[in-house]
C-alpha cells in the first residue's frame, strides 16, 4: 500500500494536522479543488473545509463537477453510487455516468433521488429498453406531474394507458395525480377508484371519488342516489363504519346502513347509530 493510500485510509477519521497545507493535502488526495480539505468523519458524513456534509451530497456535487478523483475517493468511503450517476447526469458528464451506471444497474433505483422533471426523464432514458408507458408509471409513483403534462397530447385518447395510470395513482395514494388524470385525460372506469379505496381502507381516496363524481353528476342533472347506495351497501356489509358515515354524509341512506348492520351483525355500527339517537 502506497503512502498516499495509507493516509487516505487512516487520516480521514482523525483530525488533520495543522501543518497540512493545500499542497500536502493534494499530494495525499485529500484536497477537493475549489472546496478545500476533505475528511471523513463517520459512515455517512464528511467534512469539506471543516464544514459537515452528507457523503452522498458530496458525491453528487463532485460528480456534477466531473471530478473523478474525488468521486473515486468518496465511493471508497462507501458513498452511494447512485448519487455519482445523478450528479454526473446533471452536468452531462456521460463518460462518468456510464462508468458508474453499472454499479447501479437499474435507472429506476435513482428516480427517487431526483426532483427535477427534466432530469427525471433524462435518468429514465439510461435504460433504453424502457417504454414511455414505463416513464409515465414512474412519473405517477414519484409525483412527477409535469412529465404527464408534457406528454398530455400523446396520452390523449390512449385510454388503456390512462386507465393503468389512474389505477396506479389510486393505489399509491397520489391524489393530485388522480384528479389530474381523471380531469384532463379521462378514464373509462372511474368506479374502480371506490373499489381500490375500500380494499385499501383509504377513506381519503373514497371521499375524493365522491367529490369528483358527484360534481360531474350534478352538472349533468343526474341523481347520484343509486351510486351512493350501491357503495353504501358494500361498505355496510363489510362493517366499515368510517366509510358508511362518509357515504351518508354525501347523501347515502342511513336506513340501508342500519338494515345491513343488523343483517350482518355489525354491532359497532348499530351502537354508533343508537348512541347518536340518544
UniProtKB/Swiss-Prot annotation:
Which conditions up-regulate this protein? Expressed in the early phase of the viral replicative cycle.
Supply the alphabetized keyword list: Early protein
Is Cytoplasm among the key words of this record?
no
Q: Which family does it belong to?
A: Belongs to the asfivirus MGF 505 family.
Its biological purpose:
Plays a role in virus cell tropism, and may be required for efficient virus replication in macrophages.
This chain's protein is named: Protein MGF 505-3R
